Amino acid sequence: MQHFSRTFIAASISTALFVPTTQAEANINDSVQEMPATDQCLVETSGEEDALNTPVVVEADNLQAINGDKAQYSGNVQVTQGPKKITADSVTLHQQDNVVVAEGNVTFNDGQVKARSDRVTNDINQDTFSLENTEYQFLCQQGRGTAAYIARTGQSVYELEDGSITSCPEGDNSWRLVASGIDVDQDEETATLHHPRFEIMDVPVFYVPYMTMPIGNTRKTGFLFPSLSYGSSDGMEVEVPFYWNIAPQYDMTLTALYMQQRGTKLDTDFRYLTDGWGEGKLKGEYLNSDKKYQDDSRWGYQVKHDGIINKQWIVKVDYSQVSDIDYFLDLDSDIGNREDGQLVQEGHVQYRSDFWDASLTVRDFQILLKEENRPYRLLPQLDLNYYTPLWGDHLNFDVKSQVSRFDTSDTARPNATRVHIEPGLTMPLSNSWATWTTEARVLSTYYSQDLTGLTDVDLKNQLDEQVSRVIPEFRTHAQIYLERDTSWVKGYTQTLEPQLQYLYVPEEDQTNIYNYDTTLLQTDYYGLFRSRKYSGIDKIASANQLSYGASTRFFDDDYKERLNVSFGQIYYFDKKTKISNSPNIPDETTNYSSWAVEADFNYNDYLFYHGGVQYDIDLSSMQLANSTLEYQFNGGFIQGNYRYVTREYIEDTIILENLDTITRKGISQAGIVAAYEFNRNWSASGQYYYDLNENTDMEWLASLRYQSDCWYIGLTYSNQLLGWENQAIGSTGSSPEYENNFSVNFGIQGFATNQSTGTAVKELDGSDNAIKYGRPFYLNN
């Protein structure tokens, strides 16, 4: 036996101790300090043969060697092979078996795992190793923990016995999974756990006999982490999602949601991507025997598909249905929201060519209101459009045609078939500073209205079974773009964009035609220059009018838009073409429409404003207004908003039989919304809306959230106005009815389940309140 004192020994061994030569790659988490180079993920690049021939360097205080048998290193032993390292109190190399054993305060790092162990055994020939009584941390994926025994059975494949795993940073054991066996495949980024139990602060919460879970950011089949919540409405809730990576182009998420006061709801979300046929998703939700809903089963499903085939065919499907009208009021759903009044059920296919296109549409609705005013079913509608230039870019010809079948089960309304053909000539002229477009169209429509069995006698006497209508339309619109450098504010460019439009549509009696799919459009500034007042063709409003207005914009030296002000009005040559359903309009009206004004402002990218006003000169009052001011700062924002609509404007634009059940005085609502992130862990958000007409709260929400590197908890209180007693809004003795809800949400972060990286804005966007946070700022930036 030979003895060596403190000696640096370099030995080129024909077989290597560890995995192939690697290349360092940074893998830094913002939540922790950057690890030393030896603690960073190393991506394997060389093959097994190279690994077996990589030299190993050993440094130790002492060496005892028996030729042909073993070499024993002791005292501050350090074994390295490139970037890979073992340190220990003693290391023994068994030469006959090519096995290395390290004992006593062992640290190990192979570029994929770093560990502290009592003992490490390495089989040089097989390039495998085992660790005993170990604390470990993966370097290429999230995950750390402890294990009584760890074995590497293949490249990037690890087997743990009596171990634990968590994504929490070192020193934080807020949660962990403890299992009798854990199989980790870092290449596949999955962990398979045998008899795992989930622990929070070392307290077991639940147990399953078997589970797999992803440990990276790629799509892998396995359980995602559960979330816990408590709400005053549904009690304790536990949500457990499972992700199934069926194929590269298909996947599904299955979620079990236990609600203490309702039962267990099962949700499915299947997504697919086809080769050449488009993409889509299928969603399903089922709750058997809802304890708070007469023990009835409740369900919902949604089918969506969007596809473009061979660049010419377009296929769209959007079909949703739920079991009852209270579904979204009672249950959180990915199919719809609590403010939804209807669900669309539509299929659409279209073919496009260079000069023509054709489409077929089928549409129905599920109404979610107790007082149904059900839209017509479209069974079906065929559109055929043709376009061709006649004289270069200066004269175009087009034809729009449509055949529609309207169907309803309401015996008080007729079924109908509508045929519409609309040829038109358009003459567009433009240069760098102006545009001028003139068009003439002929609107030809035929109706076949089925009045048989119509129970509304007055309506039956008013309508005709066969109606033919031909209405010409003429429109010319011009706009000029002027620009100058401002003299009173240096570095800014101002534009002036006046526009003028004349529109003529002769008057036609259309009282013998029922309204099937037509609504009055909002007349804001941009609506002044439309050619139609209605969205459909059942009502073609007569017009003999001149629209005029202008916009001015201010751009800074980076040509970023900072201010935009627009204003305009319509002059009616024939006062009879002014549309009004309101009985409050005075007999002596002017020939002018309301003034429409829009304004947007952006000061230094932290103060934003948007406002809009419609001022009725006949009533000498403001009919509609909205205003939003938002201040943004580091970590948050605060927004104030106001909306105002007179009852007269509502009566003028919407025909409602029971308007008093909705509002007595119109709309006058003020709101404030704010959110702030105190630091990387704490954030808060809130919103409050008040009805100034009825002097009552509309809704408010307050939320406080804490988020660490591996878990989060949120507290939310919401209060929402549902209605008034007996629908008597603001009446003496009638009080508002509210829904109050307090909730606590708890969830796990890590292993590809970072459900909320938790900005305060996202908290507001994800709230269940009817009035969502919005940013109505329209400057071109």
Swiss-Prot record:
Stretches assigned to coiled coil: none
Matches recorded under Pfam families: LptD (PF04453), LptD_N (PF03968)
Signal peptide per UniProt: 1-24
Main localisation: membrane
Subcellular location: Cell outer membrane
Keywords annotated in UniProt: Cell outer membrane, Membrane, Signal
Annotated GO biological process: Gram-negative-bacterium-type cell outer membrane assembly; lipopolysaccharide transport
Keyword Membrane found: yes
Gene3D superfamilies: Lipopolysaccharide (LPS) transport protein A like domain
Assembly and binders: Component of the lipopolysaccharide transport and assembly complex. Interacts with LptE and LptA.
Family under the similarity heading: Belongs to the LptD family.
Record's protein name: LPS-assembly protein LptD
Organism listed in the record: Vibrio parahaemolyticus serotype O3:K6 (strain RIMD 2210633)
Phylogenetic placement of the source organism: Bacteria, Pseudomonadati, Pseudomonadota, Gammaproteobacteria, Vibrionales
